[in-house]
């Protein structure tokens, strides 16, 4: 069978237009990519970098495995410098840090913080700090506070590996001991303990928190405003028991996994209930944990903070000053709040006497192997992050935890 052959025609004249169109398209795509990168410079990558090197876990005479903490650090307008200082004070290569300045903060504050994290050599090497670029709108006393916390938890569950406890702090917080102290003592604890102050004896809060119905405009508006109150009141719930306490918590990964994924409907049901609850961060996690049989026996009734209140208590705790320093130390708590925005004297004393930290530097620990005799930052030269050197402050934390876990205190104060 004879095949048909089509006559050859020279189509080389088509190459030039095709080449021109390709160049124009490529130029457009590159410019579009550049524009997107520029316009979304504050967008989070939602990923922690892998360290450029790794060290094996310690095995010094069969010592217990060191835990990892996942910190959420929050702030608002004007808090950028204080958030940076807090990050430096609690930084440790083993941990993870998620930093969030809410929508009230300026883009320049957020950019300055992200720029610092990106440029800091130690953080760059260990890749364990992330700044949220797309900020959440947070309304004081509203459920958007819980939403922001759950947002942070979800990111940490997705992107950070092998952490044991979640700690939420704000720009008003500061540590009273080094991370080496905390990591060392917590290495001896069961990994299923959840630290949160809680009680079902809500007293005056029944009529000022539980029965009123509030609406948080931050759920559906893009500009910040206060909550507003409905005329109607509601009765106390019958299908679950209310618990309230401090919004500052140290919670396990397994419990927070349950809160986010909720393989039964309790976390979602309570989240919907607390949408109309004033100061919901003071009750959401507490009510979830104490109404579920798998977690109600894991609670330790303490928020691991030193907080001083007026008598009778006011809406906010007292501002801590130098006169409270000795009480802070004796408390054995790893954290304290709240500190004045315009007076650093108490923080400076904590830095000098408890953290051995110089201004603008990280709190030194076993991972810092540089010399400090010449005034240089010892953490500029870093070694094995699994080498911890606890200070005398660890003994105070140990004493506090022994008291909290004593048979006479532990079970009798769980979800009561």
Report the location of each language-model feature.
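ER/Golgi luminal nucleotide-sugar-dependent glycosyltransferases, focusing on the catalytic module
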Residues: 2-416
């Amino acid at each position: 069978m004879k095949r048909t052959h089509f006559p050859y025609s020279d189509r080389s004249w088509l190459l030039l237009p095709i080449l021109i169109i390709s160049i124009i398209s490529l130029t457009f795509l590159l410019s579009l990519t550049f524009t997107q990168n520029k316009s979304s410079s504050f967008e989070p990558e939602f990923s922690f970098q892998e360290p450029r090197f790794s060290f094996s876990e310690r095995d010094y005479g069969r010592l217990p495995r060191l835990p990892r903490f996942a910190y959420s650090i929050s702030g608002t307008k004007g808090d950028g410098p204080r958030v940076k200082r807090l990050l430096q004070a609690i930084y440790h290569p083993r941990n993870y840090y998620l930093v969030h300045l809410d929508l009230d903060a300026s883009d320049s504050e957020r950019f300055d913080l992200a720029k610092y994290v990106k440029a800091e050599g130690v953080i760059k090497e260990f890749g364990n700090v992330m700044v949220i670029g797309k900020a959440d709108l947070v309304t004081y006393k509203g459920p958007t506070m819980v939403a922001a916390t759950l947002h942070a938890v979800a990111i940490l569950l997705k992107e950070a590996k092998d952490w044991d406890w979640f700690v939420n702090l704000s720009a008003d917080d500061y540590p009273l001991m080094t991370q080496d102290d905390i990591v060392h003592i917590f290495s001896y604890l069961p990994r299923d303990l959840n630290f949160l102050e809680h009680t079902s004896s809500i007293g005056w809060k029944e009529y000022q928190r539980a029965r009123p119905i509030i609406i948080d405009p931050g759920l559906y508006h893009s500009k910040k405003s206060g909550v507003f109150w409905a005329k109607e009141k509601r009765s106390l719930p019958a299908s679950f028991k209310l618990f309230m306490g401090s919004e500052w918590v140290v919670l396990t990964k397994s419990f927070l996994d349950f809160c986010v994924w909720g393989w039964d409907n309790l976390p979602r049901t309570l989240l919907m209930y607390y949408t109309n609850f004033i100061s919901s961060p003071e009750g959401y996690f507490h009510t979830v944990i104490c109404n579920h049989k798998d977690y109600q026996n894991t609670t330790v009734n303490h928020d691991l903070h030193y907080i001083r209140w007026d008598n009778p208590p006011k809406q906010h705790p007292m501002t801590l000053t130098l006169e409270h320093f000795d009480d802070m130390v004796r408390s054995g708590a790893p954290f304290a709040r709240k500190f004045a925005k315009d007076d650093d004297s108490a923080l400076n004393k904590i830095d000098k006497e408890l953290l051995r930290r110089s201004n603008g530097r990280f709190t030194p620990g076993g991972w810092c192997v540089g010399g400090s005799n010449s005034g240089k930052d010892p953490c500029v030269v870093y070694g094995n992050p699994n080498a911890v050197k606890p200070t005398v402050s660890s003994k105070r934390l140990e004493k506090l935890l022994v008291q909290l876990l004593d048979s006479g205190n532990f079970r009798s104060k769980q979800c009561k």
